[in-house]
Design a protein with these regions (language model features):
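Conserved kinase catalytic-core helix
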Residues: 97-110, 132-170, 175, 180
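Juxta-kinase regulatory segment immediately upstream of eukaryotic protein kinase catalytic domains
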Residues: 2-41
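C-lobe/activation-segment region of protein kinase-like
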Residues: 191-289
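Activation segment
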Residues: 66-67, 128, 180, 186, ...
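Low-acidity, Ser/Thr- and Arg-rich intrinsically disordered low-complexity segments
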Residues: 294, 298-327, 332-343
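ATP-binding glycine-rich loop module of kinase domains
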Residues: 47-94
Length: 343
């Protein structure tokens, strides 16, 4: 049974009345619901997040709130109706596996995460601050953007059995990029949202870049917009993904614009449109966009030790073991190309 129509009764006692009204109206009048749908998106508090000390180390505790599955399903309904190809992990167990697996894949060289009980994920706190904090303080620099781009590029090299392709974040906002100035290193966090499997790899990864850029589009001064955005893309450097990003810079209409409004902090649409148009022209002049060099390499599989799914979101080491076995048969030259690198 769906959430709309008779399905409203399923969540009627679990979420605020205003959200039920919003869900019903989304089906009845999908045009002109900016205010209602915005409240729908913003009101869904799926997690509570606290910082604690455990065994002398600071950790971040993410706890799924009561009725979070129903709230996530309601948000996913909006994404589906607006044709936005992302979704929340609504099942708590699947979210825990994915959150822990992705954190360990990207940050497990120095930091740990684990599921705790039936509703929590605990992760060691990463050093540094989010780039969103730097954006709002006006302390964002090109050096930080280059570090963020390098981390996105590194993360996008990992193989995911869930996608049967290279990994993508799903919510690549600046809030989810932690920058440590002591070693000029950026790291990714927060894996609540996942792209739809139907998206091509380059489209998923381009969406990660787009979400990051949309944070800046309404925040940085006009004189910094193009220098900052092109610095980020040049440092990322993957021609195929950047070409796909350029095709995603047109403003959407209907319900999808509401999500863009959230992403851009409800910046004036005319301002967003102008800045993205300027970026599109600038991309055409980028060296990394003009020169083909990475497309062939991106088609080669580089297995990782995490985010390999035998059920939705379950990491396993089978991909790495399989690749090592195949490489041994193929000879040393193939082994050097196949094994993933870690930083």
């Amino acid at each position: 049974m769906g959430i709309l129509g008779d399905g409203v009764a399923v969540v009627q006692n679990l979420v605020p009345t205003g959200l039920i009204t919003a869900a019903s109206k989304l089906a009845e009048a999908p045009l002109g619901l900016a205010e209602v749908a915005t409240r729908l998106v913003e009101a869904l508090a799926i997690n509570s997040i606290t910082e604690k000390a455990r065994r002398g180390r600071r950790v971040i505790v993410k706890r799924r709130n009561l009725h979070s599955e129903q709230l996530a399903d309601l948000t996913n309904l909006y994404f589906h109706m607006a044709e936005i190809p992302i979704r929340f992990w609504s099942k708590v167990e699947e979210w825990q596996r994915w959150e822990v697996g992705c954190f360990e894949m990207l940050n497990g060289d120095r930091y740990r995460a684990y599921a705790s009980g039936t509703r929590c994920v605990i992760a060691e706190k990463l050093p540094g601050e989010s780039l969103w904090e730097h954006l709002n303080r006006g302390t964002l620099t090109r050096r930080m953007l280059q570090a963020a781009a390098a981390e996105f590029r590194r993360a996008h090299q990992f193989w995911s059995d869930h996608f049967q392709g290279r990994w993508s974040h799903g919510d690549g906002s600046s809030q989810n990029v932690i920058y440590d100035s002591s070693n000029n290193r950026a790291r990714l966090i927060d894996f609540e949202i996942v792209h739809e499997k139907s998206l091509a790899t380059s489209a998923r990864q381009a969406d990660d870049l787009l979400v990051f850029l949309l944070d800046m589009v309404g925040t940085v001064p006009n004189r910094q917009w193009l220098p900052f955005s092109t610095t980020f893309l040049e440092a990322y450097g993957d021609r195929e993904v950047i070409a796909k990003l350029r095709k995603q810079l047109d403003l959407p209409g209907g319900l999808a614009w509401i999500w863009w409004g959230v992403r851009t902090n409800f910046t004036n649409p005319a301002k967003v449109k102008q800045r993205l148009a300027n970026l599109s022209r600038a991309i055409a002049k980028l060296k990394s966009y003009k020169e083909a060099g990475s497309a062939l390499a991106r088609n080669k599989r580089r297995p990782s030790i995490s985010c390999q799914t035998i059920k939705p979101g379950i990491p396993t080491a089978s991909s790495r073991a399989r690749a090592i076995k195949e490489s041994a048969v193929a000879g040393p030259s193939r082994m050097l190309r196949s094994l993933p690198t870690k930083t």
